[in-house]
Every structure is written in structure tokens, then in C-alpha cells.
Amino acid sequence: MTTYAQDSKLRLKTKIGADGRCVIEDNFFTPPFKLMAPFYPKDDLAEIMLLAVSPGLMKGDAQDMQLNIGQNCKLRITSQSFEKIHNTEDGFAGRDMHIVVGENAFLDFAPFPLIPFENAHFKGNTTISLHSSSQLLYSEIIVAGRVARNELFQFNRLHTKISILQDNKPIYYDNTILDPKTTDMTNMCMFDGYTHYLNLVLINCPLELFGARELIEEAEVDGAVSEIASSHLCLKALAKGSEPLLALREKIARLVTQKIQKD
């Protein structure tokens, strides 16, 4: 099988425009990346959709993403569709992402789920730098595979790392390793019969621990939430489809953004 590995770059820098809303100050991207112009669904909250004109990640693909959210910006970044990791044969596909959230800025990073196909190998590394006044809502959703085809946990390996620093001090680190060759993904300590996994982190967001627990109990998911450093929250949930997890995440995001815009 012939593959054409691609190194892709994305740069995005935002600032507050003349009308007091978040705008793009500078951007640069190489194929398959594209950025839609920001739109404003709610007052001063900007939304930018990240596009990837591609069927998915292949063997040798390497993505380099750098996002710089300017001071006082309120921004939600979404993706175009579910992200597919194809058969990477004897190699892997990777992504390095560096995010900086400025003073008094808010970022809601809300990509669609990641689907590793049979024999897919993916490595993801995300580093997020915050100020003490920055607010962050960051998530990833991982799927067991092409569930509709009953292709469950047939990928090779999936390894994602998330590191969050506040004023240059580490406050959160997540190291997710899913390796079906060495671990039974269906046991009760892993997916336990579920097929979709949500990992959500809230930093300086106006949502309390008990409020988050109530939202989990109301949703059609199996999940829990914990306090991490300085009363920030980490929420993890499992479901048998993407819809319940996306609905829970959207409900949390809606509550958080409503409170932020009132402040």
C-alpha cells in the first residue's frame, strides 16, 4: 500500500477587535488545514471552525498546531467532523499542539470525536499554557473504532498526553494509553462494555463540583468528576454512543459560557 505522509502546520493568533469582540489577528496553515472566519453565536463569544480537507490521518502524517488566544478574547474552537485515523501499517500518525490562553481570556476547545480504524496508531501531545486569570474548557472524545461495523478495539495503539500549566506551573497532566494488544479494553477498569470515552477539563470555569455531578446524573452516561489543583475540575464519562457525551459536553459548555458572559 502506497502512502503519502504529510507534515501539516496550523497557526492561529487572536485579539480583541475594534468592536470589542475576538477576531483573528494572524493565521497560517498548510493542507489539509483551513480555518473558517469567526462568527458570533452569542454576544462577544467568537466561534472558529477548524477544517481538515482530508479523509483522515494516515501513516507518517504529522500535525503541528499552535494557537495563541489573545488577552480578553472569548473563543470557542470546533472541528468540522469526526476525525478518522486510518490503518497506519507499521508506522503512526501524530499531532503536537501548543495552546496559549492570554490574560482574562476564555477558550472552549471542542473537537468532534476521534475514531481509530483497524491497525491505527496515533500519538497526540497537547500543551496548554494559561495565566492565572485564563479560563479553559478542553475536551477529547475517543471512540473504540468503527462501532457500526462492529470494529471494536482493533486499532494498534492510541496515546494522548495533555499538559496544562498556569503561570508556568504544572496543574494538570493526563496520560491516556489505549493498547488493545496488552490490555483488555472491555474489562471493568477500562471501557467496561462502553464504546465512547469523554475526557473534559475545566480550569477557572464557573461550575462547581456538585453542579457537574448533577449534570452527569441527568445524562445517559456513566461518569464522574473530581477536583484537581485549585478547585479546577476533571470530568470523565463513558457511553455507548457519541450523542450522549456530546450532549453532556454541550450542556456544560452552554452553562459555563452563559455565566462568563454575565460576568
UniProtKB/Swiss-Prot annotation:
Q: What does this protein do?
A: Required for maturation of urease via the functional incorporation of the urease nickel metallocenter.
Matching entries from PANTHER family are given as: UREASE ACCESSORY PROTEIN D
Report what the protein is called: Urease accessory protein UreH
The record's subcellular location field reads:
Cytoplasm
Q: Which organism is it from?
A: Helicobacter acinonychis (strain Sheeba)
Q: Which UniProt keywords apply?
A: Chaperone, Cytoplasm, Nickel insertion
Q: Name one GO molecular function term.
A: nickel cation binding
Superkingdom per UniProt: Bacteria
| Gene Ontology CC | cytoplasm
